[in-house]
Amino acid sequence: MTTIQQQRSSLLKGWPQFCEWVTSTNNRIYVGWFGVLMIPCLLAAAACFIVAFIAAPPVDIDGIREPVAGSFLYGNNIISGAVVPSSNAIGLHFYPIWEAATVDEWLYNGGPYQLVIFHFLIGISAYMGRQWELSYRLGMRPWICVAYSAPVSAAFAVFLVYPFGQGSFSDGMPLGISGTFNFMFVFQAEHNILMHPFHMAGVAGMFGGSLFSAMHGSLVTSSLIRETTETESQNYGYKFGQEEETYNIVAAHGYFGRLIFQYASFNNSRSLHFFLAVFPVVCVWLTSMGICTMAFNLNGFNFNQSVVDANGKIVPTWGDVLNRANLGMEVMHERNAHNFPLDLAAAESTTVALSAPAIG
C-alpha cells in the first residue's frame, strides 16, 4: 500500500511539470493543449497518406466491383496518384479498420481515405485552437485563428459536408492532384458551381487578395526609408524590433492616390492591414458556404434556353454552351456506374448541340 501511494505521489509531482512545459511560451515550438491533440492526429494522417499514396491497392470507389488504382506501386505518378475515397458501398458509414473483416477488405473499400481525412480535420481544427491558445498566452488579439478558419472551413466543406449532403464518402475530394481536378469537373457538371455567386466571390477573393498583396508589398518596398548605401543590401536598413517605421506610408499613400484617385488609397496602416486580411477570408468563407449549400443540391444559376426570339425560337447563349460542357463531363464520369446522367434521363429531351448542319 505504501509503495502504491509513493508511485501516485511521484506521478502527481510530474503532472504540474508536464502542464508547465505544455503551456510554456519559452519553448522553441509552442505545444499547447490543442497541440497535444494536434500532433498525434496530423502525424497519423501524414503517415497513412504517405503509405497509401505509395502502396495502397485499388479501391472500389463506385461500389460496382471495378476498383480504381491510385498508388505509385500500381502504375501512378505524382500527378495521377491519389488516396482514393472510400467505396460507395460503404456510403456514410464510419469505417475504421476494426469494422472490416480483414485488412484486405478495409483497403479494398478505401478505409485509408477515412483514416486520413478524419485525423486531418481534427488536426487542423486543433491547429486553429492552438493559434488562439498561443495568442491568448502572449496577450495578443485572436484574429490569426479567425483568418485561419477560412481554409479550415474549405477543408470541412469538401471532405465532410459535401459527402454528407451527397450520401457517401465516395463523393469526397480524392487526395491527389488529378483527383482534385476530377472532383472539380464533376462538381461543375453536377452543381454548375461556376454560376454560383458564392463561388464567384471566392474567385474574387483569391485573385483580389493576390492583387492586393502584390500591390501592398510593392508599395512598401518602393517607399522604404533609406538607411543603407548603394553598395549594401537595403534589407540591412532594418533592425528587428526597431521602433521607427521602416517605410514612408505618406509617400505610398500619395503615390497610389495619384495613380488611381485619392480615396482608393488607405491613409491608416491598421485599417489597410485589416482589409488585406478580411477580404480574402470572407470570400473563402462564402465559397465554403457555397460548397455546403450545393452539397444538398441547391445549385448554381441555370440559364439554359433562357433567351427566345419573337417566334419562341431558342437563341443560344453562353449559358447553353456551359450546359453542353456540363452534360459532357457528367456523361464521362462514373460511366460504368450509370447509364445516363439525370439531365439526359429526364422525360423532356435536352438540346445538346447548339446547331446542327442540314443533311441531304
Curated annotation (Swiss-Prot):
Q: Give the Enzyme Commission number.
A: 1.10.3.9
Annotated compartments? Cellular thylakoid membrane
Name of encoding gene: psbA1
Q: How does it assemble?
A: PSII is composed of 1 copy each of membrane proteins PsbA, PsbB, PsbC, PsbD, PsbE, PsbF, PsbH, PsbI, PsbJ, PsbK, PsbL, PsbM, PsbT, PsbX, PsbY, Psb30/Ycf12, peripheral proteins PsbO, CyanoQ (PsbQ), PsbU, PsbV and a large number of cofactors. It forms dimeric complexes.
The organism is Prochlorococcus marinus (strain MIT 9312)
Could you list the residue ranges that cross the membrane?
30-47, 119-134, 143-157, 198-219, 275-289
Check the record and name the InterPro entries matching this protein: D1/D2, Photo_II_D1/D2_sf, Photo_RC_L/M, Photo_RC_L/M_CS, PSII_D1
Keywords annotated in UniProt: Calcium, Chlorophyll, Chromophore, Electron transport, Herbicide resistance, Iron, Magnesium, Manganese, Membrane, Metal-binding, Oxidoreductase, Photosynthesis, Photosystem II, Thylakoid, Transmembrane, Transmembrane helix, Transport
What protein is this chain from?
Answer: Photosystem II protein D1
What PANTHER family does the record point to?
A: PHOTOSYSTEM II D2 PROTEIN, PHOTOSYSTEM II PROTEIN D1
What residues correspond to the site Tyrosine radical intermediate? 162
Q: Which GO terms describe its cellular component?
A: photosystem II; plasma membrane-derived thylakoid membrane
Classify the main location.
Answer: membrane
Changes after translation: Tyr-162 forms a radical intermediate that is referred to as redox-active TyrZ, YZ or Y-Z. C-terminally processed by CtpA; processing is essential to allow assembly of the oxygen-evolving complex and thus photosynthetic growth.
Binding sites annotated in the UniProt record for Fe cation: 216, 273
Q: What else is known?
A: Cyanobacteria usually contain more than 2 copies of the psbA gene.
Please name the top-level EC class of this enzyme: oxidoreductase
Taking the record's annotation, the residue ranges forming a coiled coil are none
Record GO biological process: photosynthetic electron transport in photosystem II; response to herbicide
**Biological role:** Photosystem II (PSII) is a light-driven water:plastoquinone oxidoreductase that uses light energy to abstract electrons from H(2)O, generating O(2) and a proton gradient subsequently used for ATP formation. It consists of a core antenna complex that captures photons, and an electron transfer chain that converts photonic excitation into a charge separation. The D1/D2 (PsbA/PsbD) reaction center heterodimer binds P680, the primary electron donor of PSII as well as several subsequent electron acceptors.
Where on this chain does [CaMn4O5] cluster bind?
171, 190, 333-334, 343, 345
Positions of the record's site feature: Cleavage = 345-346
* Annotated propeptide span(s): 346-360
Residues that coordinate or bind chlorophyll a PD1: 199
Q: How is the cofactor bound?
A: The D1/D2 heterodimer binds P680, chlorophylls that are the primary electron donor of PSII, and subsequent electron acceptors. It shares a non-heme iron and each subunit binds pheophytin, quinone, additional chlorophylls, carotenoids and lipids. D1 provides most of the ligands for the Mn4-Ca-O5 cluster of the oxygen-evolving complex (OEC). There is also a Cl(-1) ion associated with D1 and D2, which is required for oxygen evolution. The PSII complex binds additional chlorophylls, carotenoids and specific lipids.
Annotated signal sequence range? none
